[in-house]
UniProtKB/Swiss-Prot annotation:
Propiece residue ranges: 273-305
Site (Cleavage): R272, S273
Location(s), subcellular: Secreted
Gene giving rise to this polypeptide: C
Protein's UniProt name: External core antigen
Amino acid sequence: MWNLRITPLSFGAACQGIFTSTLLLSALTVPLVCTIVYDSCLYMDINASRALANVYDLPDDFFPKIDDLVRDAKDALEPYWKSDSIKKHVLIATHFVDLIEDFWQTTQGMHEIAESLRAVIPPTTAPVPTGYLIQHEEAEEIPLGDLFKHQEERIVSFQPDYPITARIHAHLKAYAKINEESLDRARRLLWWHYNCLLWGEANVTNYISRLRTWLSTPEKYRGRDAPTIEAITRPIQAAQGGRKTSSGTRKPRGLEPRRRKVKTTVVYGRRRSKSRERRAPSPQRAGSPLPRSSSSHHRSPSPRK
């Protein structure tokens, strides 16, 4: 596919097979990463989408090394793998774990082969300048079948009779660098997705926003320590853990009418409700006894006497 002929060398056949496979894998890294990123952004909240875009602006040393990152991601994903979860973050994080493991090993192999070729490169050969090597942004726009041809033309324009071993070394260096930049993007995205599983998407979004604000603030106006996601989620966990559950059963409202509490007062030695309106005295009917006066304290004489 790549039309690479290095049969005069004793190790030409082996290098040709490894070189062809590594070029094919490294060229496929970019579209795989871009496709999955765009697909995931379509189903993402606007704030989370912005936070995910801001992940690319964070310093490189903020993220763990690839070996540590993959190990932490697998620990976070293991419970979801056992339950065959199909959550968005689980599927995307699983994709990036497989992608990073495969292409990271491939990239390390490319570096090892490039270093081993140094011994057979003529000592007087000048290295290909960086400007003649295809960059990551250019590789995204060049068709897959033309990537090798474009790089070969640049090497020839630098030096037409450039030694073939030095050419292979230049190709490996160029494609390994493209792979590393693609892996860096995949590493940041993997960190985002498996942390969303650990802490929740809303908490990770809030954390990224606070962290970028802290980083963009001048040193003399900001706190000494950067915000941590543990400190952000601790108040939420404390509030949830501090809730007390009542042991008794509570009657649901609406099943029985609520009884109205009526205040009462004592009027002339008997209880009388305030809610009841005082009735006006009814007119005296014929034949009814006269009402007893409250001012008279003596008894009326008995008619028997």
